Amino acid sequence: MSAQKPGLHPRNRHHSRYDLATLCQVNPELRQFLTLTPAGEQSVDFANPLAVKALNKALLAHFYAVANWDIPDGFLCPPVPGRADYIHHLADLLAEATGSIPANASILDIGVGANCIYPLIGVHEYGWRFTGSETSSQALSSAQAIISANPGLNRAIRLRRQKESGAIFNGIIHKNEQYDATLCNPPFHDSAAAARAGSERKRRNLGLNKDDVLNFGGQQQELWCEGGEVAFIKKMIEESKGFAKQVMWFTSLVSRGENLPPLYRALTDVGAVKVVKKEMAQGQKQSRFIAWTFMNDEQRRRFVNRQR
């Protein structure tokens, strides 16, 4: 297993502080959500879900050419810089086979969400093609609306409904399909109560009372599942063995470092040939993803070159 030291990825477009004047020009509705910090600096009211949504609209339009983006109330509104970091580190992982980032990689996003965030960034930054899976018909409808509202995305992103309860890859990866990588931001809580407690902690950290709005939205399938993150990723690992020749790299975010040991044991049990951990950091937030493959170095080189 190899690891990388944390830090915002060099190719991430969000190293600098937000240029709020420019972002307000891109999306004028953002202006109403600007606040002043105790130091007298302009900022965004991150505790307000409407403010975070307005900021995301501006960021996606300004940096990623997504002119039309929206999500229904109650769905996760993702922090764009952190999502971009996953995409850039994934690009580096794909580049290790041949020394260059593949321009026409095919990526499977497990749980694409109503926001469709990973495909939007990946298509713009690297020209990749995406398949996004979802269990929620409402989330799929939202993601499809985003795709249809922005020219060119229909050719780059396709969506599939996961109809099989508890399945992850089964029913989504079709016979004879090949993917350079899968990615996933798994539900991390193990119950609805734990998800609510997590939201309450964030509320307290922001100094909010129980009546204040909160930007940490999320539907059940986005926030929790039976057994939590470890159980979900273990299921993913178990199913991945059946697609060992169709997918070069399987990857997933892991929210807590203490969840890694049981996942490493599961990867040993299924016979993963190589396992990689990539550490990431966005401000005070530390995150990571693990990646595993059933292909050796030569097999991965051949896989990458199959359509080149």
UniProtKB/Swiss-Prot annotation:
InterPro entries: METTL16/RlmF (IPR010286), rRNA_lsu_MeTfrase_F (IPR016909), SAM-dependent_MTases_sf (IPR029063). Keywords: Cytoplasm, Methyltransferase, rRNA processing, S-adenosyl-L-methionine, Transferase. It catalyses: adenosine(1618) in 23S rRNA + S-adenosyl-L-methionine = N(6)-methyladenosine(1618) in 23S rRNA + S-adenosyl-L-homocysteine + H(+). It is found in: Cytoplasm. One of its GO terms (biological process) is rRNA base methylation. One of its GO terms (molecular function) is 23S rRNA (adenine(1618)-N(6))-methyltransferase activity. Its EC number is 2.1.1.181. It holds the Pfam family Methyltransf_10. GO terms for cellular component: cytoplasm. Specifically methylates the adenine in position 1618 of 23S rRNA. Belongs to the methyltransferase superfamily. METTL16/RlmF family. NCBIfam families: PRK11727.1. HAMAP family: 23SrRNA_methyltr_F. This is Ribosomal RNA large subunit methyltransferase F.
